[in-house]
């Protein structure tokens, strides 16, 4: 039994023959610290996942889509006419589906005037946090807040604007939302006087699909104002792309869009007769859709990835250490070797 206790199938080098190196220990410590940093980074990616964006052909068949709008127009509600016309030549009068409130026209603070917002794709977590569906409120009689029978009417505001808001379903084909005045372009029972028409406007909300009021869109909080030419024609060209956001089982189906805007002065288009004063939103739906998803590796894939990366780094570190040690010995001599440092017992008489 005593022989078995002293038996070692894998004999090791005795301590008296080992040469310890401070430089070698330092490089090993740096290697281990770097491996620990890599492992910590990989654990962070495993728990946090990564964002994957793909462009795919839109396979869903959608007959209609919803347009959400909240707009201030510098014209009285009585003179406005709102239509939708698409490439099927289907004309839809949508005044009855929208809410119209009389209001004193104004431009809210922090609104971009004669400009549009920068077009960006929002972050996945931002979308999931702000994708709260909502509906527009009911119409209010804004004049009821003021006593118009008061003989002193100097304090009463001028109701020179119209608040247009609501959601309308339209055919999911290329089309145009038209905000014009009665008798302009279409036959109407009443004719709007040109001197009372001003198409300066503020867009608080303009989006496609389900109504998520907290998600920003390129036209949100923008305004167009031209004091000298109130009958200016404003045209917005939008290109709509369906976008699906997916994370941990939650899905948010939205629609992003890019936009270009143009304006035409009444004096320039009146002679041609091809455009009428108003606000026009031309929309086109792209055949592609964007899928933004949060992707996570399985635990087995994570372990294989971590072991492979750490093994490769150790292999590279060993070769770098060996090559650097050989270079130091060749250029500066054996005493600069990273593997060991000779002590006093191993030094020769001439080295002391």
Curated annotation (Swiss-Prot):
What more is known? Present with 3000 molecules/cell in log phase SD medium.
Q: Which organism is it from?
A: Saccharomyces cerevisiae (strain ATCC 204508 / S288c)
Q: Name one GO molecular function term.
A: identical protein binding
Residue interval(s) of motif Isoleucine-leucine motif: 349-350
Record topology, Cytoplasmic segments: 1-23, 333-352
Q: How does it assemble?
A: Interacts with ERV46.
Kindly name one Pfam family recorded for this protein.
Answer: ERGIC_N
The protein's location, in the record's own words, is: Endoplasmic reticulum membrane; Golgi apparatus membrane; Cytoplasmic vesicle, COPII-coated vesicle membrane
- What InterPro entries has UniProt attached to this entry? Erv, Erv_C, Erv_N
Summary of the function given for this chain in its UniProt record? Constituent of COPII-coated endoplasmic reticulum-derived transport vesicles. Required for efficient transport of a subset of secretory proteins to the Golgi. The C-terminal Ile-Leu motif is required for exit from the endoplasmic reticulum. Facilitates retrograde transport from the Golgi to the endoplasmic reticulum.
Encoding gene per record: ERV41
- One Gene Ontology CC term in the entry: endoplasmic reticulum membrane
- Report the sequence similarity comment from the record: Belongs to the ERGIC family.
What are the GO BP annotations of this UniProt entry?
endoplasmic reticulum to Golgi vesicle-mediated transport; protein transport; retrograde vesicle-mediated transport, Golgi to endoplasmic reticulum
Lumenal face of the membrane = 45-311
* UniProt-recorded name of the protein: ER-derived vesicles protein ERV41
